[in-house]
Amino acid sequence: EPRSVDQVTDYAIIVGNGPAPSSQLLADLLAAEPLLLCADGGANTLYRLGHCPAVVVGDLDSVDESLRQTWPTSKWVRVDADDTGTDLQKVLRYAEAVGIKRAVLLGVTGGRTDHTLWNLTLLSAFATQLDLCILDDDCLIRRIPESICFAAPVGLTLSLCPLSGDATGITTKGLRWPLTDEALTPGQRDGISNEVTASPVEIQVGQGELLLVIQRQGAGRDLALIRATAKQKDQG
């Protein structure tokens, strides 16, 4: 039985309409009893994986209509197709409206390249409202707005990718190729395939935004990184 949207929680799993996560990955995440939401056709994915969402959000043009009878306890939120944004944006707005503060996005990478690229930009677009990360069976992706510190095993591969233009004033600790008040520039200076040499890893950013792309480490360490508090820049 899924957690009801009326039950108090600030943590959600959101399933998109892209390539499905493994059943094991989803089961690991659901052990923490988050609110389970899906964006339109993500409902079909959840059905195939044997899970029932609390809420389905979108224009509902990609959902198997029989699921309304299969899931009588689920809430269905139809947002007009004319409303701006993708179904994933619509479910993120819904999550914010019901008090979600932190969410893991599944089924939003792979498949169509344009969808994957757009979904990555949502980590920035919703940064002031939601602490988001993207997870698939290979890696975890999250935005580093200013600084983050997390435990990681020695030898783990991670990458730092500028999200929107230059990222400057970057300083790292615990990596084979450290950065000290340096810049990463799209198409010029990259932060691809670095390696953990000491734990915890610390990453600080002066200006701009970075994406942290890190190999999955197993359920326990994945959840720790999902919960890691990234210090936000002053929005004032």
What positions do the PLM features span?
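N-terminal nucleotide-binding beta1-loop-alpha1 segment
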Residues: 2-19
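Acidic/Gly/His-enriched mid-domain segments of enzyme catalytic cores or analogous surface patches
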Residues: 29-32, 37, 41-129
